């Protein structure tokens, strides 16, 4: 089935082996356990084993890890003939990205004695970075080769770490749930990549750029996993105690309100007042994205529900009206609609975070101001300036993401072969008659395009 241009017999093994060998060498030279992981360092100090950060952070890490490998992977299985590619390539680029992210984040966020120290929190942060890459993957789903995806991941992880360093370390931005650093960055990076990869003849594969009953059901599995674990995602690296508790609670109510808004808007905007599974699979998650920045702040359950409600409405409207405009006018072919699930809700979350930060007072936060806004607590800046920093961070994130998406890519499958597993995967024998039929169609379409 695969022709010369899509064969991976040589290219993929070479790229995978070279990348992994380089990673192993770099890990050997630069990475070591942190003091809570190292046997000698841990036992040189006087403390109870249950004080180890592992017992506080690992439950959240488990949830985040499930979101990365099952949630994101299955959410993208809605394409009728691209289930292997959705879950399989998600697995591939996530495995690479979390290793590369460990190095890049460790390098930019400070090395100790010339070494990158790793522990459970660095694992969570690497998964966060990987999540941003998978968001971008959603924008180009079905239109890229594994080599392209690994190339994109390498560039994006590096730029993610740069953006994260500028925001969190230099500016003191608060973004625990990643509305800006993860969702906005990943969405607009992916949108720029898919714009650069614009395919004028992609309509030749439009009959495969759709779902069937069982593929939508599989995608809904991803949605449910993401929905259930999103409170852990947003609260995973916040300060222990009230901060983590508050973040999970705010996310919980934002998601619930978003879901009702999604169902309502889907019925209003869809044909004959019926629900559109695309809306339910995606827009119901927008509340988790939109509350990511302000989740650890004193947003209140009431405020969280408003944010989630607005996010659901915006997301559904984006799927219904904005996505067709982006494709027809701006030539942005966003396969999974990441602009509607991650892009616009991420921007909304950044704005909500900026406003909430600007309104922060000691009367509301008390001594808790030290955890949420340490620069405000120590008098370095006032709350209004913190709000300005949050707004500036959104602009910086958008700039780096859009410019970073201008990367050189190669090895793309032909327009007639997009959204199809058979290009890169061995499919079960039961699919053989269908594949044989598609081979004839491909030949005819290729001849038409060449003429």
Swiss-Prot record:
Entry-listed glycosylation sites: 44
Gene3D superfamilies tied to this protein: Ammonium transporter AmtB like domains
Keywords: Ammonia transport, Cell membrane, Cytoplasmic vesicle, Glycoprotein, Membrane, Transmembrane, Transmembrane helix, Transport
GO biological process: ammonium homeostasis
Top-level taxon in the UniProt lineage: Eukaryota
Side of membrane Cytoplasmic, spans: 1-11, 85-87, 143-151, 198-216, 271-274, 320-340, 412-451
Subcellular location: Basolateral cell membrane; Cytoplasmic vesicle membrane
Record membrane topology: Multi-pass membrane protein
Chain ranges passing through the membrane: 12-32, 64-84, 88-108, 122-142, 152-172, 177-197, 217-237, 248-270, 275-295, 299-319, 341-361, 391-411
Extracellular side: 33-63, 109-121, 173-176, 238-247, 296-298, 362-390
GO cellular component, one term: basolateral plasma membrane
Main location: membrane
PANTHER family xrefs: AMMONIUM TRANSPORTER, AMMONIUM TRANSPORTER RH TYPE B
Protein name listed in UniProt: Ammonium transporter Rh type B
Species annotation: Tetraodon nigroviridis (Spotted green pufferfish)
Lineage: Eukaryota, Metazoa, Chordata, Craniata, Vertebrata
Gene that this polypeptide is encoded by: rhbg
């Amino acid at each position: 089935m695969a022709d010369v241009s899509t064969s991976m017999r040589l290219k993929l093994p070479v790229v995978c082996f070279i990348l992994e060998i380089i990673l192993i060498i770099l890990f050997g030279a630069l990475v070591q356990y942190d003091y809570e992981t190292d046997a000698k360092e841990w036992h040189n100090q006087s403390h109870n084993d249950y004080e180890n950060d592992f017992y506080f952070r690992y439950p959240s890490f488990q949830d985040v890890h499930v979101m990365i490998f099952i949630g994101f992977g299955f959410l993208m299985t809605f394409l009728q003939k691209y289930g292997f590619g959705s879950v399989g390539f998600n697995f591939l680029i996530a495995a690479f990205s979390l290793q590369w992210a460990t190095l890049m984040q460790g390098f930019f966020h400070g090395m100790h004695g010339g070494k990158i120290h790793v522990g459970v929190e660095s694992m969570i942060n690497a998964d966060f970075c990987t999540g941003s890459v998978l968001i971008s993957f959603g924008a180009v789903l079905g239109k890229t080769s594994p080599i392209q995806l690994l190339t994109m991941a390498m560039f994006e992880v590096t730029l993610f770490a740069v953006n994260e360093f500028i925001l969190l370390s230099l500016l003191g931005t608060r973004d625990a749930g990643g509305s800006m650093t993860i969702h906005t960055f990943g969405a607009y990076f992916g949108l720029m990549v898919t714009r650069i990869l614009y395919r004028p003849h992609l309509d030749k594969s439009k009959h495969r750029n759709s779902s069937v009953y069982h593929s939508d059901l599989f995608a809904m599995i991803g949605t449910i996993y993401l929905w259930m674990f999103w409170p852990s995602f947003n609260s995973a690296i916040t300060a222990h105690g009230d901060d983590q508790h508050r973040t999970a609670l705010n996310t919980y109510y934002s998601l619930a309100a978003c879901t009702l808004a999604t169902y309502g808007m889907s019925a209003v905007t869809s044909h004959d007042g019926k629900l559109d599974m695309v809306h339910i699979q995606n827009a119901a998650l927008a509340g988790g994205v939109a509350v990511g920045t302000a989740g650890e702040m004193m947003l209140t359950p009431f405020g969280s529900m408003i944010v989630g409600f607005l996010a659901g409405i915006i997301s559904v409207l984006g799927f219904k009206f904005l996505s067709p405009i982006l494709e027809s006018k701006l030539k942005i072919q966003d396969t999974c609609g990441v602009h509607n699930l991650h892009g616009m809700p991420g921007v909304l979350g950044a704005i909500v975070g900026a406003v909430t930060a600007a309104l922060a007072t000691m009367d509301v936060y008390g001594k808790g101001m030290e955890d949420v806004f340490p620069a405000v607590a120590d008098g370095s800046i006032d709350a209004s300036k913190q709000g300005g920093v949050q707004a500036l961070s959104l602009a910086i994130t958008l700039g780096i993401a859009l410019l970073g998406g201008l990367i050189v890519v190669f090895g793309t499958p032909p327009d007639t072969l997009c959204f199809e597993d058979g290009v890169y995967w061995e499919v079960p024998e039961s699919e053989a008659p269908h594949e044989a039929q598609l081979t004839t169609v491909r030949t005819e379409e290729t001849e038409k395009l060449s003429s």
